[in-house]
Structures are given as structure tokens and as C-alpha cells.
Amino acid sequence: MTTTKNTAHWTLEAIAQAGVKNIVFSPGSRNAPLIISAEALGAFEMMVLGDERSAAFHALGRSQVTEAPVAICCTSGSALANYYPAVLEAY
């Protein structure tokens, strides 16, 4: 049986294998399994910022400085829409 914890772990392993070393989290109850799994995996430098818009722009700046991808992760619902301005700015 596949659990939420297993799915989170497998997802983060794939992200690590793709070369992502930084994740910026905007925490919420729905993405808690990803935060817990990322910490347990130990493959990432993690930052937690409660404001999604600030988190996305922080990730964009970090990506520009390091010239490497930075993952962003938020809870479900409209929280994702707050990432949109930084995503647009990235392109």
C-alpha cells in the first residue's frame, strides 16, 4: 500500500536525483509530509517562509545567485497562486 509518507519520500528522492539542493517551503498542514520527508532525507538545504509570495521571490533570488534550480512547496488551495508573480518574473 502506498502512503502519503512514501509518496512524499519518493517525490523528494526524484527531486534530489535531478540535482535540486534547495527547497523553500511555505508550510501548511497539506504539505507537512513533504517537509517531514525532506528533513529526514537530509539531501536539501531547507528554508521555511510563511508568506508564499515572499517565499517564491526568495527562491527566485537564490536560484539566480547559485545558478541552480530551487524547489518551492506550499500547501493546497489558493496558496499556489501567490507563487505566480515570481514564476512570471523568472521567465
Q: Where are the regions a protein language model picked out?
A:
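Thiamine diphosphate
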Residues: M1-A81
